[in-house]
Each structure stands twice: as C-alpha cells, then as structure tokens.
Amino acid sequence: MQQGQMAYDRAITVFSPDGRLFQVEYAREAVKKGSTALGLKFSNGVLLISDKKIRSKLIEQNSLEKIQLIDDYVAAVTSGLVADARVLIDFARISAQQEKVTYGSLVNIENLVKRVADQMQQYTQYGGVRPYGVSLIFAGIDQIGPRLFDCDPAGTINEYKATAIGSGKDAVVSFLEKEYKEGLSEKEAVTLGIKALKASLEEGEELKAPEIASITVGSKYRIYGAEEVKKFL
C-alpha cells in the first residue's frame, strides 16, 4: 500500500481519494480465506452445500456446522470469521421469529436478508467498530417460491439462481455459469453442486465431508445424513 493511503487504511469511516473503504475490503479478504459454500435453486426448492474442512483429528466433526437453520423454511450458510457469523445468524433468527409472530405467515426472505444486510452496513460507517468479516447465503421458501440471496461484509445483497462464497468462490461460480440450468431435480442439483465444489479444490485435495441441506415447496428444512452425502461423492 502506498504511503499516502495509510491514513485511510486505519479509518473505517473515511473514503480514500479513489473511493475505497479499506477496512471493508479487508473484511472481504477474510471471507476469501473461509470454507467454500454454494447455493442453487432447483425445480421445486433450493439447496445449500458447504465444504467442511476438518483442521484437526481431535475436533468432533459433528460440532462443525456450516449450514444454519434460521426458520423452518429458511437456512443460511456462512464463510469467514466464525464468531461474526454466529452473531449474524442469531440476529437473523430473532428477526425471523419476530416477523413470524407479528404476521403469522411464512417469513419474507428478501425482507429478512435486508435486515441482516442493514445490520452489516451499519458497521461500515461508524467509528469504534469494524465490518463483519463474513458473507452469507440465505436460502428458503416464501410466498414467491424458492429464494436465494447472498450478503457480503459491505451489506450488499443480490438474488441468484446459483451462487458461491468463500475461498473457492471464483472457481465454483465459473463452473456453475457453464453447467447450471433451470428446472433441475433435487438429485441433479446436489450432483451439480458437489461437482462445483470439487472444481474449487487444490490439486491433491479431496472433498471428504460436505454439508448438504435442502428446502422444498411444502417441506421444511432438511439436512442430509452422512450416508446420503456419501452417495454423491
């Protein structure tokens, strides 16, 4: 970094002369060091898949949950700083329950994601705080049908047919842009998602224990069991 940019590097609320917020950019770099995760829509639902890398043989594998239940028909997968992700997941759960109690209907996923994004955006413009070092993919079913959004450290949100976050994002997105098509069955979507994750691996790496979850129209959140996952590897 050039000497003249150092002052802007330390201040979260000050733009550099070329319009950059360096702390937000650094938060995005933290996401790039996280596990790869993806989401994609299929014919009557939406799917989340995450690579779950086990860093130590001493860790209980079942204790590492990358895909999180928000509501019966909404889930999220995260990549980046785990503690930051936990705070935002709890925020999303509370927001979803408040809406459900107030309106008594399916949670509007776009509104939910906007509330989480607003929370993240606030941490890019006030002194004494830092941006959340995490990105999230939200997937679920609402009144419109299957929905899929992502949200980054700046609080930017987009809706997708298929998307990815984490260290292998570029490779996964490149693969999906070539191979994804609308109208896939759930089985076809899982097969495609696993292939996309494998395309992001370094030479010599193996996809050993991915997490897979789906939500379909009329059916609640479902996490795939270990034996189900093995069939797709």
Curated annotation (Swiss-Prot):
Pfam families on file: Proteasome, Proteasome_A_N
Domain of life, source organism: Archaea
CDD domains xrefs: proteasome_alpha_archeal (cd03756)
Record localization: Cytoplasm
Notes on how activity is controlled: The formation of the proteasomal ATPase PAN-20S proteasome complex, via the docking of the C-termini of PAN into the intersubunit pockets in the alpha-rings, triggers opening of the gate for substrate entry. Interconversion between the open-gate and close-gate conformations leads to a dynamic regulation of the 20S proteasome proteolysis activity.
UniProt KW keywords: Cytoplasm, Proteasome
GO molecular function: threonine-type endopeptidase activity
Major place of residence: cytoplasm
One annotated Gene Ontology cellular component of this protein: proteasome core complex, alpha-subunit complex
GO biological process, one term: proteasomal protein catabolic process
Function: Component of the proteasome core, a large protease complex with broad specificity involved in protein degradation.
Cited NCBIfam families: arc_protsome_A (TIGR03633), PRK03996.1 (NF003075)
Quaternary structure and interacting proteins, as annotated: The 20S proteasome core is composed of 14 alpha and 14 beta subunits that assemble into four stacked heptameric rings, resulting in a barrel-shaped structure. The two inner rings, each composed of seven catalytic beta subunits, are sandwiched by two outer rings, each composed of seven alpha subunits. The catalytic chamber with the active sites is on the inside of the barrel. Has a gated structure, the ends of the cylinder being occluded by the N-termini of the alpha-subunits. Is capped at one or both ends by the proteasome regulatory ATPase, PAN.
Entry similarity comment: Belongs to the peptidase T1A family.
Protein's name according to its UniProt entry: Proteasome subunit alpha
Organism: Thermoplasma volcanium (strain ATCC 51530 / DSM 4299 / JCM 9571 / NBRC 15438 / GSS1)
Taxon lineage: Archaea, Methanobacteriati, Thermoplasmatota, Thermoplasmata, Thermoplasmatales
